[in-house]
Regions:
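Active-site glycine- and acidic-residue-rich loops that bind
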Residues: 68, 131-135, 199-203
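Glycine-rich nucleotide/cofactor/substrate-binding loop typically near the N-terminus or early
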Residues: 1-52, 109, 118-122, 128-138, ...
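Divalent metal-coordination and catalytic microenvironments
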Residues: 6, 66, 141, 212
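Generic secondary-structure signature for well-ordered alpha-helical cores
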Residues: 11, 25, 29, 42-53, ...
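Mobile "lid/hinge" segments at catalytic clefts and subdomain interfaces of large enzymes
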Residues: 83-183
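A glycine- and small/hydrophobic-rich beta-loop-beta segment
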Residues: 172-233
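Conserved phosphate/anionic-ligand binding catalytic regions in large, soluble enzymes, centered on
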Residues: 59-82
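Flexible, glycine/charged-enriched surface loops at secondary-structure junctions
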Residues: 31-37, 50-59, 85-88, 121-132, ...
């Protein structure tokens, strides 16, 4: 698959958050891009602090030049495309063990797991062994996108592929993105709230159902059942 790959003269220097942000602020990019990139690195810093239990942290892989390019490049793409929403399908985390600067850990890395605890993204193990989602990737997606279980109905206008550096003979190591037009497509999502009660009067139930309809419920009903100790509910 033909894909775009960005090469950097990567530096593996360990950097503090302040040193990384100083590099970010020197980038030739609009203020909105710089601000978003700063938020992403702050997300990573908070995750690292939570994992290691200290405010004195140094970025290792995340502070390298290629990771900084990943973050600024992603923010610039969002700025130029200016999409209405950015949606992310369930992310494959990978399986097995991984080795980083702090030792060997089960996949996903501790910082990645902490970043996913924001609740904005859906995750799954996936079919491939090894680390499939890095802390940098998790931070970018947590900042710019929201997770969805499946692709919504819409018209695919463009498709883009970004290539990674790992060579997997079984699967192309690319990230795919769709630019879609979903306006005018109907997507009706209904939440259902159910509860069992056996200690309220019929008058109370009737009043509750009426109030629910007044507050915007599509429908409301009460179904009589026989509950414990033979009590009607």
């Amino acid at each position: 698959i033909a894909a775009i790959k960005v090469h950097t003269h990567a530096s593996s220097a360990h950097r503090t958050l302040g040193e990384v942000l100083a590099i970010v602020h020197k980038a030739d990019a609009p203020p909105a891009v710089i601000a978003q990139a700063e938020r992403i690195f702050n997300r990573i810093a908070k995750a690292e602090e939570a994992v290691h239990g200290t405010h004195h942290i140094h970025f290792h892989e995340v502070g390298a030049d290629d990771a900084i390019a990943d973050v600024i490049g992603s923010c610039m793409a969002v700025h130029l495309l200016s999409p209405g929403r950015i949606l992310s399908l369930p992310i494959a985390l990978g399986t097995g063990m991984m080795t980083c600067a702090h030792g060997t850990y089960p996949v996903p890395a501790p910082a990645t797991a902490e970043l996913l605890s924001s609740g904005r993204l859906l995750a799954m193990s996936g079919e491939h062994a090894g680390e499939q989602l890095t802390p940098t990737g998790a931070a970018i997606l947590s900042e710019i996108s929201e997770g969805i279980p499946s692709l919504p109905a819409g018209y695919i206008q463009k498709t883009g592929y970004g290539a990674g550096s790992r060579d997997d003979p079984k699967s192309p190591n690319v990230l795919r993105a769709f630019l879609m037009e979903c306006s005018g497509m109907s997507e009706d999502i209904v939440d259902i709230l159910e509860t069992n009660v056996d200690d309220v009067t019929g008058e109370c139930i009737g009043t509750t159902l009426g109030r629910m309809m007044e507050e915007g419920a599509r429908d409301a009903c009460a179904i009589p059942v026989l509950m414990k100790k033979g009590r009607p509910g």
